[in-house]
Amino acid sequence: MGIVLEPPCPKSVDGISIDPEPNWNFESLVAEIASVEKKLNGFSMYPQPITNTTLRMGRRGGGFVMHVSEDEMESDEGEESDDEEEEEDHSQICTAGKRFACDELYLSDESDEEFDHEPEYMMNKLGLAESALYEVINDHQTEIKDDIRNQVSVVETEIMNEIETSLSAIARVEKYSETRKEVERKLDLQYQRKVAEALDTHLTAVQREHKIKSQIEERKIRSEEAQEEARRKERAHQEEKIRQEKARAEAQMLAKIRAEEEKKEVERKAAREVAEKEVADRKAAEQKLAEQKAVIESVTGSSATSNAQAGGNSIRAAESALILENHRLKKLEELETTNQSLKSRSNENFSSFEKHIGRVIRQISGTKDSVSGKINDIVKIFKDPRCPVSISIAAFAKKMVTTKEKPNPFACSYVIVYINSQFPQVMDILLAEFHKACIYTVPKHIVNSQSAWDSDAYERLDSIMRLYGALVQTDIRVGNATNVHGIEHGWAWLARFLNKIPANRATATALNSFLQTAGFGLHQRYKSQFLKVVNVVREHFLQKLRAKKDTSDLLVIIAEITAYLDDRMYLKEPEGRAMKTTSTLSSELTAELNQPNYNQNYQRNDYRNYY
């Protein structure tokens, strides 16, 4: 338990509090005394200066220290700021002498009556015993404070030691952490170095492989460039020839211009010839239309065998096939009439465009880039504003069917389908050209009107039927490129052929050529139904051929059809059906041509109404 010492006087007198723990310096004391003096002067008429006194015990004591409480200091802060100059004057007086002086204080005689009472003193007078007790208490407090200060110093020293120890430990921990981080950094650096070495090795190998591939591609590109350069030179040579022909024609035209009379005569003759030709063509078209109408009417009124008698010749064909043939031939005639009118009204020579189309068709080969390139070339010709589209379509259909140097029929069929996707009227005109060139593409047969066929005629028949078979089996389903005369039309043709067409060398050649190119696609689509048709060919069509009296010219074709059926060649994809790859194509055509083996996944449909 501690001893609490309290002075034998009130803790606060006139706003002045006694501080149990004095810690003032001399300047603070002087300022406080000046403040007290100012307050006391307010109650005394004649303020008395404070002087030094001796202790009652007959000895001089230490300086008396007064302390104002914090509450009083806060209340007096405003007053101290107002009397700052006055406090400085009092401080100088107290420092120079040993008493307080108020030299600047003005006292008037009129204010003497206001303060008649006796002066008051700051402290009550103490007795001897009380003074001694106060001294003892003060000494005891001083000793206790010294002990407390010593203990606080010891505690502070121990705390500082603990802090230093903690700081040292923290420094060691941080140093250890830095050491571990450095070790981990070195390990990570070593690992990254190993990864970089492995990656560099891998990249070197990949780069070497890519370099080898690039060398191979460069050699391939150089080879293709050489071929393209040769083709370019050939095209340049052809263009030069065309240019020379045009120059020659222009020279002739200039010669005609010089002779105006001759030119007028030529124009009059040409006009007469054109008019006569138009009249003749119109008459021929009307006559042909009348003949076809008569044929259709005779077919419509025929019996189940569909035999029509016309001038002693019997036409054997299905009624639906004849209607389609007539419809297509009519479109072709209308197109030819339109083209003739365009040629007569225009001074432009369109033969160069027709020759260009024929040259492009002859250059078609069984490669993807060739097919794509020729399609682009033909489309450019069709879109050339110098030549009407109808003339280009007619030339394309005629050249495609009648070209003797027949290229790959499968490649030509792809070209036909894609051109028809751009210009839908092409297919009917092309089929009409097929029907004009070979009646077995209808299929149709005229009995007792067949003249002696030579080898060239059979070759043309074989070429046309192979192209027709390749066309019907071509199945392309990308964007707008759809075969409108697809495999179902081939199935209908085969049914009509076996039902209506008799067996002879020409019909056998047509059937064999058709099966060679379309048999694989028909089997892929119709499976067991196609096998039934194969049995019909074997048991009926071939038997009729063998039953002929003179079979010397039929032995070869019978052997070919028999080998095709017995060896089941319809299970093997025909040669040339799959396009070869020679370069990289970046078009919609390439995506379709890259289909594996071009095996069309046909859906089963019933086409019984075609029989």
Curated annotation (Swiss-Prot):
Its main location: nucleus. Coiled coil: none annotated. Pfam families: GLE1 (PF07817). One of its GO terms (cellular component) is nuclear envelope. One of its GO terms (biological process) is protein transport. Residues 71-89 have a biased composition (Acidic residues). Keywords: mRNA transport, Nuclear pore complex, Nucleus, Protein transport, Translocation, Transport. It is found in: Nucleus envelope; Nucleus, Nuclear pore complex. Disruption phenotype: Lethal when homozygous. The keyword Acyltransferase does not apply. Residues 69-94, 220-243 are annotated as: Disordered. It comes from the Eukaryota. The keyword Transferase does not apply. Required for seed viability. PANTHER family: GLE-1-RELATED, MRNA EXPORT FACTOR GLE1. Part of the nuclear pore complex (NPC). The NPC has an eight-fold symmetrical structure comprising a central transport channel and two rings, the cytoplasmic and nuclear rings, to which eight filaments are attached. The cytoplasmic filaments have loose ends, while the nuclear filaments are joined in a distal ring, forming a nuclear basket. NPCs are highly dynamic in configuration and composition, and can be devided in 3 subcomplexes, the NUP62 subcomplex, the NUP107-160 subcomplex and the NUP93 subcomplex, containing approximately 30 different nucleoporin proteins. Belongs to the GLE1 family. This is mRNA export factor GLE1.
